């Protein structure tokens, strides 16, 4: 019977065959190849240390990928066959002798990369094998901390087990970046993963506990249960799935009530037990029977003892009070009066407090008081801002100048006054009930102070993280897309362009100064008013505002007059330079009217921005239709299907007045991309735009236009030179007319553009062309008949030429 070879858990896969083809000693070589392809640490390394290197496949990969003249050292318990450019020796990495040997090979160098692909001899219990491998990883890390350079890389194999997380924690303390990965060449059934640690911190001193397996893999003691929280805050319960206690299989604890009375820690019993039993034991219990007959032991107490897990804070307090009463009756607790009488003889002497200590305590108390006050003010300010944001989001804002006209200059006619409240009888109501409400609200605010501050800080932190992640995403996107980088560069260039100062800047600063002034509503007195408005503004309260208004109008009028005069002079200069048109006198007239008219308070920079828009010579805006939507709208307005009022009405939609203040950048980008009106377009408009872009794209680019221009310029230069030479030949009396004509013809032929060389057409001698004599049918110009024999002759000629060269 033939012997069938076992495949050993699928180890003879494609990586095994590839390792045989490439000449690697083990399939594990491809694990390092894939790790290096992902992280790229071998190309940057000059010195490498490979721990547990047998049979040497990782050293082979390192010798191929690392630069020339690199130092590679491999060590293992098993012997390693020699590898070119690699130093190998046989030692145990846990011994001091191995450290000395490595130090002798490295000399004064530090390793840029330390590799570890070792594993113990497995085959016993899995828990023991995983722990042995974790210990081996810790030993390799100890060697790495001794020989690794600052910023170096450490790559190790780890088994997935309960010791994996402690190892990962140790790695993160010593390296800047720690990533766990599983290369494709690693078998899926294998529990191994590879941890790549980059950026070694190289601390000056390392705590020995970091590299001690007894300390790193020690099992943590169970935390003491918080029974006080279970008793005093039973409503706030968080399930913690931590398993069961040893030996507690039923999860139900029942103890007699006498144990609860006699214990010194009743809260622990209430937090851990399920029931307090009044049931008598078989032998009988006199104390338990007495407890059951006491008048303090009511039916409510008995019901509470039946199930402690469903009780609330109030019921637990009742049980504790009942316990104290019972202990006093049984004489287990001494009353406070008796305790004072017994301890009256012993009087404690309190030493007077030192002056310096008293000053320190007073300063500490004042500092705490000041911090509490600032925290309270900050909380109120945050609450006010939050309410203001909510009001703005819900469009609940109201004009703040409504009712301001009733205020006098000193505020004597304010809306609220204490005298009016006393007359109306509201002062007593405020003193009785409102003050209590305020105090209660302040106490509630003080309780929720910490939670609100924490939630506010957490929200700000999350927003900052989202913004930073979005910026990283944008940078990665720009790195991949060259068009996006060019677009951003154009935006930055346009933003950096400086065109000097303009009058609008000065006007903007004047507006800011005006905004800084208090908002005192000024009622216009000039102009046409309705009857109701005239009656309203005839009140006594508006009589003192005329002088103030006139002074402000005069000041603003002088400024606006100077601006208008400057614009008028500029317009006149432009009209002198440009040809006169019909629109010029109208513009000049408008400028004069604005200069002579009284300036209004509502004038802003928007009126001056219109003059900066690009315009044609005839005064019309220089607007080009480049989208299908614009073309469709232009066609509709040209045919009369839509009017300007319809276009104005279409501008009022749900996309027009979106509130974008305070929104993050990533949200605004997404909204601008997707949340926009979808305007219908016609087939004719789309075709017109396509035709327009087709005509634009048909035009040659700038480089082609420049090349054609250069060719035309050179041709013109040649013709001019030829004309001058022809004139010289015509004036030469020594030459005959025939010679002159021939010389001019030769110069013309040389100056003329040469015809492109006609390619020789190859005709294969097979089929109808086999053995043909003369020109084949359908072939014009130069031709050459070729066959397979000719190919062989050409190859033979090339071989002979090479031999002669040698």
Swiss-Prot record:
Required for proper assembly of pre-ribosomal particles during the biogenesis of the 60S ribosomal subunit. InterPro entries: RNA_methyltr_RlmE (IPR050082), RNA_MeTrfase_FtsJ_dom (IPR002877), rRNA-MeTfrase_E (IPR015507), rRNA_MeTfrase_SPB1-like_C (IPR012920), rRNA_MeTfrase_Spb1_DUF3381 (IPR024576), SAM-dependent_MTases_sf (IPR029063), SPB1-like (IPR028589). One of its GO terms (molecular function) is rRNA (uridine-2'-O-)-methyltransferase activity. Component of the nucleolar and nucleoplasmic pre-60S ribosomal particle. The lineage of its organism: Eukaryota, Fungi, Dikarya, Ascomycota, Pezizomycotina. It catalyses: a ribonucleotide in rRNA + S-adenosyl-L-methionine = a 2'-O-methylribonucleotide in rRNA + S-adenosyl-L-homocysteine + H(+). The keyword Transferase applies. GO terms for biological process: maturation of 5.8S rRNA from tricistronic rRNA transcript (SSU-rRNA, 5.8S rRNA, LSU-rRNA); maturation of LSU-rRNA from tricistronic rRNA transcript (SSU-rRNA, 5.8S rRNA, LSU-rRNA); rRNA methylation. Residues 441-460, 494-515, 546-556, 602-612 have a biased composition (Acidic residues). It comes from Emericella nidulans (strain FGSC A4 / ATCC 38163 / CBS 112.46 / NRRL 194 / M139). This is AdoMet-dependent rRNA methyltransferase spb1. The keyword Acetylation does not apply. It is found in: Nucleus, Nucleolus. Disulfide bonds: none annotated.
């Amino acid at each position: 019977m033939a012997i069938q070879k076992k495949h050993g858990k699928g180890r003879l896969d494609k990586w095994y065959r590839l390792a045989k083809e490439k000449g690697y000693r083990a399939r594990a070589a491809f694990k390092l190849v894939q790790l290096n392809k992902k992280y790229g640490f071998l190309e940057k390394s000059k010195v490498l240390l490979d721990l547990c290197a047998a049979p040497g496949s990782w050293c082979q990969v390192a010798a191929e990928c690392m630069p020339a003249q690199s130092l590679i050292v491999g060590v293992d318990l098993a012997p390693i066959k020699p590898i070119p450019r690699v130093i190998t020796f046989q030692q145990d990495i846990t011994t001091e002798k191995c450290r000395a040997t490595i130090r002798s090979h490295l000399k004064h160098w530090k390793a840029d990369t330390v590799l570890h692909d070792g594993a113990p001899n497995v085959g016993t219990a899995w828990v023991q094998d995983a722990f042995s491998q974790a210990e081996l990883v810790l030993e390799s890390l100890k060697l790495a901390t001794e020989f690794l350079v600052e910023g170096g890389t450490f790559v190790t194999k780890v088994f997935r087990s309960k010791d994996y997380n402690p190892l990962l924690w140790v790695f993160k303390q010593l390296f800047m970046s720690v990533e766990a990965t599983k290369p494709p060449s690693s078998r899926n059934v294998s529990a191994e993963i590879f941890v790549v640690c980059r950026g070694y911190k190289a601390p000056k001193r390392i705590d020995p506990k970091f590299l001690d397996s007894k300390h790193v893999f020690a099992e943590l003691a169970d935390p003491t249960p918080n029974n006080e929280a279970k008793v005093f805050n039973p409503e706030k319960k968080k399930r913690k799935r931590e398993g069961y206690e040893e030996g507690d299989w039923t999860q139900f604890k029942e103890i007699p009530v006498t144990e609860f009375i006699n214990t010194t820690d009743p809260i622990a019993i209430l937090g851990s037990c399920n029931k307090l039993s009044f049931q008598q034991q078989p032998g009988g219990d006199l104390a338990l029977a007495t407890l059951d007959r006491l008048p303090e032991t009511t039916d409510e107490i008995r019901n509470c003892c039946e199930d402690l897990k469903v009780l609330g804070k109030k019921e637990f307090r009742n049980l504790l009070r009942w316990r104290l009463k019972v202990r006093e009756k049984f004489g287990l607790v001494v009353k406070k009066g008796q305790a004072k009488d017994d301890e009256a003889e012993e009087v404690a002497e309190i030493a007077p407090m030192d002056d310096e200590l008293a000053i320190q305590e007073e300063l500490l108390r004042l500092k705490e008081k000041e911090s509490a006050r600032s925290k309270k003010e900050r909380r109120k300010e945050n609450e006010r801002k939050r309410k203001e944001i909510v009001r703005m989001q819900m469009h609940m804002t109201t004009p703040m100048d409504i009712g301001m006209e009733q205020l006098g200059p000193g505020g004597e006619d304010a809306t609220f006054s204490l005298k009016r409240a006393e007359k109306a009888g509201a002062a007593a109501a405020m003193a009785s009930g409102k003050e209590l409400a305020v105090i209660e609200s302040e106490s509630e605010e003080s309780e929720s102070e910490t939670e609100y501050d924490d939630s506010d800080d957490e929200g700000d932190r999350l927003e900052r993280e989202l913004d930073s992640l979005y910026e990283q995403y944008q940078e990665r996107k720009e790195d991949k897309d060259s068009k996006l980088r060019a677009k951003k560069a154009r935006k930055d260039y346009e933003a950096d362009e400086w065109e000097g100062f303009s009058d609008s800047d000065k006007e903007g600063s004047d507006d800011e100064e005006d905004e800084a002034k208090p908002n005192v509503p000024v009622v216009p007195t000039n102009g046409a008013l309705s009857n109701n408005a005239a009656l309203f503004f005839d009140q006594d309260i508006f009589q003192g505002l005329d002088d103030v208004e006139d002074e402000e109008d005069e000041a603003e009028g002088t400024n606006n007059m100077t601006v208008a005069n400057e614009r008028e002079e500029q317009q006149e200069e432009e009209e002198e330079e440009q040809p006169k048109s019909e629109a010029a006198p109208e513009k000049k007239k408008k400028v004069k009217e604005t200069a002579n008219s009284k300036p209004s308070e509502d004038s802003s920079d928007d009126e001056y921005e219109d003059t900066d828009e690009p315009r044609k010579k005839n005064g019309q805006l220089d607007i080009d239709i480049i989208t299908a939507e614009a073309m469709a709208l232009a066609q509709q307005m040209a045919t009369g299907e839509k009017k300007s009022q319809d276009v104005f009405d279409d501008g009022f939609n749900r996309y027009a007045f979106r509130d974008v203040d305070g929104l993050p950048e990533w949200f605004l980008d997404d909204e601008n991309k997707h949340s926009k009106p979808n305007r219908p377009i016609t087939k004719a408009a789309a075709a017109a735009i396509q035709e327009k872009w087709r005509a634009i794209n048909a035009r040659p680019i700038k480089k082609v236009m420049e090349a054609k221009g250069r060719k035309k310029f050179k041709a013109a230069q040649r013709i001019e030179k030829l004309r001058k030479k022809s004139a010289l030949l015509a004036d030469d009396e020594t030459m005959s007319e025939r010679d002159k004509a021939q010389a001019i013809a030769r110069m013309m032929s040389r100056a003329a553009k040469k015809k492109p060389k006609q390619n020789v057409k190859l005709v294969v001698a097979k089929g109808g062309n086999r053995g043909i004599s003369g020109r084949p049918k359908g072939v014009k110009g130069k031709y050459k008949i070729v066959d397979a024999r000719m190919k062989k002759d050409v190859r033979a000629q090339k071989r002979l030429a090479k031999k002669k060269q040698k």
